[in-house]
Amino acid sequence: MSSKEETPSTGGAAPVATVAASGSATTSYANVVQNLETKKSGTSNTTTTTARATVDNKENQPNLKSFKSWSEEAAAAEAAGESPIVGSVSLAQTGEKRAAASGGDNTAENSSELDDNNDFVPVLSHHRRDRKKARKEKPRDQQPAGGRGDGQKPQQAGGRRVPGSSDTERKSVRPRAPRGGSPRKSAAGAAGAAGSNAGAVSSAVPGGPKVHKDRKDTSPSASIEGAGSSGNEAKSADGDQQAGEKGAAGAAPPPKRFIAAPPPKVNAWKISAKQSGSPKAGTSPLDKRVLQPKAQQQQQQTKQTASQNNNAQNTASNKKTQQQQQPQQGATTTTQTTTAAAAAATAAAAATAATTSAAAATSSAAAVPAATTETATTTTVDASQADALAKVVVKDKKKVNQKASDFSNVGDWPTLIGGTSGSGKATSNEPKRNPTKKQQSAKTAAAVAASSNTTSSEVATESNVAGTTSSSNSNPSSSTTTTNTTTNSQATTAPVASTSHDAKAQRDAEPAANSAAGTTGTAAGPALTKKIPKHKWRPLPIDLAKSSRPKPIGGRPNRRFSDDIADQRRPPRVYHDRQPGAGGAGVESRHPHAGRHPYGSRPATATSERVDSWRSSSSTTTAAFDEQRSGAAGGAGAAGTGVGSATRGPRRYRTPYRGGRQGRGGFSRQGPGRPTYRIPRHLLASGEYANYLPADAAGADSQSSYVLMGTHYFGNVPAAYIELDANSIKEAIKKQVEYYFSVDNLTGDFFLRRKMDPEGYIPVTLIASFHRVLALTTDVAVIVNAIKESDKLELFEGYKVRTKTTPTTWPITEVPEVNEGEPKAIGTLEQEQLEQNDGQEKLEEQTEADSPPPILTSAMATKPLNSIPPPPMPRNPQNLVPKMLQDKQQSRSSTIAALNSVNAISALTQQVEGGAAELAGHLSGLAESVKPKSTSTPDKRNAASAGNGAGSAAALVAEPEGIWKEVKRRSKTNAIKENATTPPQQQQPPLSQTLNNNNDNVKTNNTSSKSKSSSNNAPSNASSSATVCVTTNNASSATKATTKTTTTSTATTTTNNNIKSGNAAYSKTHSKSSSKTAAPPSAQCHAEKEELDFQFDEELMDPLPPGTGRINNFTENFSDDDESDYEFADRDINKLLIVAQVGRAPKHEGYDRTADFTSRTKITQDLENIINDGLVNYEEDLWTTTNVVADYKTVNVISQADFEKLAGGRNKSVLPPQVVPPPPPFEEDLDETLVGDTTLNSTLNNTLKSRRARFYAAPNSHSIDPRTPRKRKLRHTANPPVEAHVGWLLDTVEHRPRTTSMGSSAGTSPTASSYGSFGSSVPQSLPVFQHPSHALLKENNFTQQAYHKYHSRCLKERRRLGYGQSQEMNTLYRFWSFFLRENFNKSMYNEFRSLALEDAGNGFRYGLECLFRFFSYGLEKKFRPNIYQDFQDETIADYETGQLYGLEKFWAFLKYYKNGEKLEVQPKLAEYLKSFKNIEDFRVVEPEINEMLQGVGSLNPGRQLNRHRSVSESDGTAVIAAGGRRLNTTITNRSDYVGRLLQQQHQQQQQQQHHQYQQGYGGYNQQQNRRRTGSFGSTTVRIRSGSLGNKPQVANRNQGSQHELRRGGSNSGLAPHKRQQQQKPKPGAGSQTGSTRATTSAAATATTAASAATSTAATPAVTVSSGSSSSKK
């Protein structure tokens, strides 16, 4: 890496080395050799390096915990390392900030500045600020990198080494791990070294000027590194030393600025030391690339130490750091640490000597040949360590991700590079590579360093920084690193490239660099000091940033987690390196990333580099790109990052996060989350998976801390957070699923148990949907494989799983179980028959017979969706279904078997019929027909059997005939009784049908199974005939059949028939009489129609042909379904409870119908909704307790506790009967519970539909705009009717009316009224139900009363008070108008109509208007042809009497009904409608204002009114185009009124049809957009705005304001002369706002109106949504 980095440093860090290594600027091997020679010759440089090492030691002595200010670090680096580098390159440059001079190493020297500039991000500094600064400085650094800023000739020619050659050298010569002992040092020294490394790498890999890469190492570390390894200076004390040595000790490195860095909680220094030890590691994942074999590193370090006191000091600190790291890494690491520390010190000196490249190269070379030269040795040590680190990193590349994942390094986060954990990782990872690569790299690096000492000096510095980082990271595996070093020398740059890791590496390396490079110590120390407090940014290493970070293009998907030393240690990102890299070293700096090679080094060592760092994924392939992106600066940054940085180097994670990378410190989240294959954060958050992490990923350092989910944690990072391998994930899944099926869990997991089929199986997909499993994997195949490996779970057909221990004891079934004995016998028969059939079927049958309890055989249970099990809870007894299936199979298999099974089947069928048929009610959502005797099942069976005999059986089981019934809404009370009685009655014929169906099934199964028995043939025939019948039914049920998708079309047809006609009897009954299998097709079809064992409520109350619409086909007969939904049974009418407001008893008879004697509560829309919900909840409560309550013939209301006791006892008593196999008990149970439940559910499902309003609030007022022409309706009269709130709910029992006027004989039970009911003949206060509405209702005198009682009272009052005089009767009219819209009952409708017409005939039209509202809105909701005809008839009659309300409602219906244009209108009515094109046309009554002003003589026909007309409700939106004034449309409660231009309105009035149409403000065009809202009481939003009741009416009735619209609507009804008056513009526009009082003179009024009209023209367009409420009214 050193040489590599050094070579790239030509772009940035290398510029320092450029002077010394101008010749070596070329990436040629000669340059590397020259660098090495330069290092060797640079003993003085070594001295400088020693000084730098001393500085580094100072830094490292605090274990990098006390971060010196970056300025100090920079100064020290400049003094110690920069001077040597500059000496090589130019002392002046060293004196100057290398950042400025070299843009690479200069930056490194000015690491503090660079730090501030975001160029240098020492590993130690975790400050986000530092990181940010680094990024900020990148461009600046890069520019210097582009050409040495301080006058050093850019080493493009010389210092910059040709990217190719320089890279090659660098790559070949991995900078020795600059002092494995001191990450910071290495970082500092590596600032030069790593900077060089970065530069070298960048130049080597992408070619010096990958400014972008450098930029990518935007994190302060990277930036600093990029800036002439200024960032690395802190880290690259070694780098600077190397640079000094290498470049020339000519100029003492300027005193490094030490930035106080938060003391790493973890031994970040150790990590950094490793990094510094292996610049190459910088290129390759620093963490992974451990220094060369510990012995070599130690020797080298020792040599370095010997040659450099400072280095020795640094070594000590490095040792501390490395030791800290090493403890994590292990004893070897410790030894390496010591050696690395010495080596780091030596390397720091060497690096200082301008051996940044050379040193790094030498380190790489020397890693193999430990004693390249004293100077070289120093460099070599650094290079060796760097090389070892690089190599280790390279090897660790594989583990790089692991280390990245490793949060153990996180503990070292203060170093950000996570050297400690990284080192641990590096040790294990790097040793793998070290043996070969490290030595080779070391040798190569030495050669490269020699050739490119001058050029590499800065690069070397960076390289060393990286190397130092790498040393920290990779010292333990330095031997491996050695081999890798060669690669890493190239890769060193790449390691620098990893931004996140670089930042970490740099930070870590900075401590290492401080220790390793006394020279760098100044920069590194300050960085360490300054950065110490900044642990907080460490949390960012989490993968969070990784996702954001550019993925390593070629880099390993795996990145080390925080644990990755290289990652954490990565010399502070190649930020500084970038800067130098920008110049020349910058290229290399970038390539330090490349050197690290995960990113930048892709070209040369990218792959190998990448191996070391999971970040290398970003570094190796991305390094090149990143370096390119970062440019020279990025390269320098990468190199500066050194090994650590290189690992992460090029990957400047330009993430949405601040600081480029997510990481606060500028290094993106390193370890944990960066791997390409990140572990979900939630997984990362749990340590339980730690053991699943790769060694690298796992927290290698106990001291390391890690950030997870944005939170910083101290201690080893759970490996699980890092990454789980496939086996670990599989194991975790297996354990999780085993837990789901464990006794401990199942005892309380009722959800899971309810999802089980009778055999205890649960679809794997359900398990896969659990969050804990999803957290592990989303691949069902993985889950299936994990389940297969479990010895506690059993998987069937790959899609269902259950526990192996007593699986059938867990399913919670609501269906009574049939005796297993019969099923067994049947199963045996079936087995015999099946033996003749396909073996699979036989096996299936045998399984069933053998284990009667399990309905599904393993195969069956696991049948894929073909035979989707019914709902999770099998509705039918577990055994019943299999038995039935078996019976069917038997019948098909052999006639005899069929006969035998028929007996059993008949019993089972009877039992199943009642239970399953009604259970089907629970499955109302399922589209299976209730009647598919065996048809639907056979169809599915056919499909299944075609695939597999057993499969077919499974399919059958999965779809027990009874299971797939579709049950329509039932009458709540009668359903129970009906079910109890009907099932037996209907079961008999259905059984034969069922048998026929079974035969069909058998035929299907036979076809698929190819079993050959005469019985099968007969069934086939039967099924064929049945199919034919079904086909007849198919028109409606075809869709259902299609839904079922069976193997054969015939089966499908049968399924359709079954679906259609199949009801409770569908499967239950058909199994009863297998002997009837051969029933004639016609008979079967007929039987199918009659197959239902019960009638739907609609059928009972309004008999419908069995095959008409009652058997709802989900896909076809939507209207039928809707119709049933909107039907209301007569017997349910008797259950109605009316909730009405009861006023105080009148003091005298003869009410003033207009008197509001009842203090009606003003109910807003919100309150209305609350009350409606309360009634719904109340009703649900009634029905949930109904099953029990209905049985108790008590009038008394019992407490809830008593009720529960009673109910509980009853339930318990009932449950045992369910278990009882015999059909009779079963039927009894069904009668009580199953039927009741089904009825209850079906009824509730329909009656409690959210769309059904329970409370119809009355409009608060009928205020009408006095200026608006009115309609001929009661609400627009001077004395509008008083309307009352009314609500309803459905009781659980019937309240039989004393008279038969309303009560339907159907379903009326003589004792129904005797049931203690909440409804009673006398109004009762509402029972307490837990809902806010209860208090509202009670406070406002709402009482509940049985409907028939209330109805009879209203009629009584009507008779007593006379037509139209009864308020209660009016309330009843209103109730009918709303209730019948969604709950149509023919008898109720007929009564409503007759009474309304009777009242109308006597001059009281309220009832008739309610009737018209029902017509209009009810037909819109559910079109009924007979009602539509009545609507037309009544409309014509009403119009012919001179009324317009009926016509208005008909007009509105045609307009708003979705199919209105398709309706046929009677010619006479159509003729009447021709004159009404707009809702305004119905406003024929003069405005109320005229009546008010009649006493004022000035009111003349031609007089103009002040009021602004509002468009009638029919106008959807009125756009007032003229003028800035808005028309005064104050009535907001009516959507009808939209202010319009008076002129337009006037024109409308003048030419209602013409202009309204033309202008478009007329009703039709705009009305199309209007929504008609429902009546006030309706909770559902209606497309039409209904009667006022639909929404809270705000009476904005400002008597004095003529501009205020009255509820009545717009002016359009004004007489033409009035319109003309309105049109007249007058100055009094203000009158629009002002209200003209009735007392105002007519003239004033006219003036106001005129002005209003004028203003209207000027009024800006105002869009008002008008409700069609007026049209509705």
From Swiss-Prot:
Locate the Phosphoserine modifications and list their residues: 66, 69, 102, 111-112, 182, 186, 219, 221, 223, 229-230, 236, 284, 562, 608, 851, 1119, 1124, 1261, 1510, 1512, 1578, 1585, 1610
From the UniProt record, give one GO term of the biological process aspect.
mitochondrion inheritance
> Where are the Phosphothreonine residues found in this chain?
107, 828
Q: Name one GO cellular component term.
A: cytoplasm
UniProt keywords, alphabetically: Cytoplasm, Meiosis, Mitochondrion, Phosphoprotein, RNA-binding
Gly residues compositional bias: what residue ranges? 632-643
* Pfam families the UniProt entry points to: La, LARP1_HEAT
Biased composition of type Basic residues is found at 125-137
Q: Residue spans with biased composition (Low complexity)?
A: 41-54, 179-208, 239-251, 294-392, 437-493, 512-527, 943-954, 981-1083, 1299-1317, 1543-1568, 1622-1673
Q: What is the effect of changing residue 182 to D?
A: Phosphomimetic mutant, partially rescues mtDNA levels and hatching rate in spoon null mutants
Compartment annotation: Mitochondrion; Cytoplasm, Cytosol
Q: Where is the composition biased (Basic and acidic residues)?
A: 501-510, 560-579
User: How does inactivating the gene affect the organism?
Assistant: Mutant males show multiple meiotic phenotypes such as a failure of chromosome segregation, cytokinesis and mitochondrial partition. Defects in spindle pole organization and spindle formation. Mutant-derived syncytial embryos show a range of mitotic phenotypes, including failure of centrosomes to migrate around the nuclear envelope, detachment of centrosomes from spindle poles, the formation of multipolar spindle arrays and cytokinetic defects.
Q: Where is the HTH La-type RNA-binding domain?
A: 723-814
Enumerate the PANTHER family for this protein: LA-RELATED PROTEIN 1, LUPUS LA PROTEIN-RELATED
Q: What is this protein called?
A: La-related protein 1
Q: Which organism is it from?
A: Drosophila melanogaster (Fruit fly)
